[in-house]
Amino acid sequence: MDWPFPPTPPTCATIMGRFSKMHGLGNDFVVIDAREGAVDITPTRAQAIADRHAGIGCDQLILIGQSDRADVSMRIFNSDGSEVEACGNATRCVPLFVGRDVLIETRAGLLEAKAIDGGAIVDMGAPRLDWDAIPLAYAMDTLTMPVSWEDLPAPAAVNVGNPHVVFFCDDMNGVNFDRLGPLIETDPLFPARVNVNFAQVIGDNHIRLVVWERGAGLTRACGTGACATAVAAVRRKLVSGPTRVTLPGGDLVIDWQPGGHILMTGPATHVFDGEADWTRF
């Protein structure tokens, strides 16, 4: 009897490489060290590696490389293969991965990450609030945008290295994240697509948050989403000072004052190390 599944065809050459599986509050990453040798990561390869059934599985693939401007560079690929500018949770993992405090070159600019017990503090830089920096398709107020989707309140928009829209809901229990998330992410108002944040103030300087991430969908946590939401909340005078942001995966503390940089504090976890043949993806 013939085996019903054809064998995997042999390859002429293999490109073996090591990786680490890491996460920040359950937002998980495959982290590849490309400082000693280039690793060819295409959108198709990133998508295959991120596949939880046929690949290694992750929300984002992180490529750590050399930099002329910083200690290391970081490239970020979502699970759909798209390359993005920033990822707060991944940034907290970098000092744990390299074993020291680091200045990181990203597509969003230079980010400084300092290791603390169990995690890191990251200077995420200053938020951008102008409509064309989000970017939006046309000019409008980004603090209270004159747009709406179904019963959601008027949102705010913030760019923290990547674009975010933030809805402050009175009660999130009735919000259909799986339907509204992709609907808003791909709305023509957002020419670069957008990360969609559903937030609820649940106490003094305490926000509950669920994020539909651009290119990844619902995740356990989104560091840049927590930063964008805290910035929007400060601008609307809903919070003041360091703010606890509770996501499905746990808590982050975000500190921002108007005109300043955003400081994000939270955990980072190393899960395991592995080795893979990248030509098979």
Region spans (language model):
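Internal active-site segments that recognize and position negatively charged phosphoryl groups
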Residues: 143-174
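Short glycine-rich anion-binding loops that position phosphate/pyrophosphate groups of nucleotides
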Residues: 25, 127, 163
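Hydrophobic alpha-helical segments and helix pairs
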Residues: 100-139, 143
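A glycine-rich beta-to-alpha transition motif near the start of alpha/beta enzyme domains, typified by
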Residues: 3-118, 166-281
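Generic low-complexity segments that are intrinsically disordered, proline-rich and/or Lys/Arg-biased
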Residues: 5-11, 128, 136, 156
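Active-site-proximal beta-strand elements of phosphoester/diester hydrolases
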Residues: 123, 155-159, 208-210
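Compositionally biased, intrinsically disordered/low-complexity regions enriched for serine, proline
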Residues: 1-7, 132, 143, 150, ...
